[in-house]
Amino acid sequence: ATDACGNSSTCAQTIVVDDNAAPSIVCPANVTIQCTASTLPANTGTATATDNCDGAPLVTFTDATVAGGCPQERTITRTWRATDACGNSSTCAQTIVVDDSVAPVLTCPANITLECTVSTLPVVTGSATATDNCDGSPTVTFTDSNAGGACPQSGTITRTWLATDDCGNTSTCAQIIVVSDNTPPTIACPANVTIQCTASTAPANTGTATATDCDPAPVVTFTDATVGGACPQERTITRTWIATDACGNSSTCNQTIVVDDSVAPAIVCPANITILCTASTL
């Protein structure tokens, strides 16, 4: 201060400019994303901050993760922090839920028609394949539903394939397997045989044909065709064996039975006798 005569005096004032105010921070909204999506802020959002003095406060974040109900699910608590040039900071929290609600993609093998002699296991009829957005190895199983066909050995199998990922999401597809029986039984005839005319020509004596088939018990029958021999007691029988399964398929084979008469008659002479010359010798 200076008066009119030029006298002056001074005093000093100290002005301290301080920054004790933390930035104002605004978190991005909580979000639920699929397990295939990125959890980076570019996808889930970034916090914004303003400060009374610092025009560009530093914004950072840290994550704390809690596992979910299955390997592909989790909850991330993302803590955002805004710090100004004077070290003042403020925080806010964002919740990011990582979900797996997408079912696997399942591809069924082609429908197929096969004979009853062929296995219906997947190694023959084909297996379904599955891929998943998060689980690298979804579980693939199947169940069969059988509908009878026109005969016991034929029918239609509806094979329902099921793919399940680690989070329990499932998808299904159906494969149709038609089982046909167009194959006749395999029949084996008994050996050809020659018997004496005194022997029985019934199968219990001459042998019986055997048969195998999809049908566990094909019916085996026979018919005979007889040709006379050189004498009344001799003949040749052609026995045609027929095996028929439950689906009506049949096969045949022939057995030859020769009926022979090669045994001489058994003769019994009367006792020796002495008679008078006047007696008859008849």
Which residues are covered by each model-predicted region?
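Proline-threonine-serine-rich low-complexity tracts
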Residues: 1-282
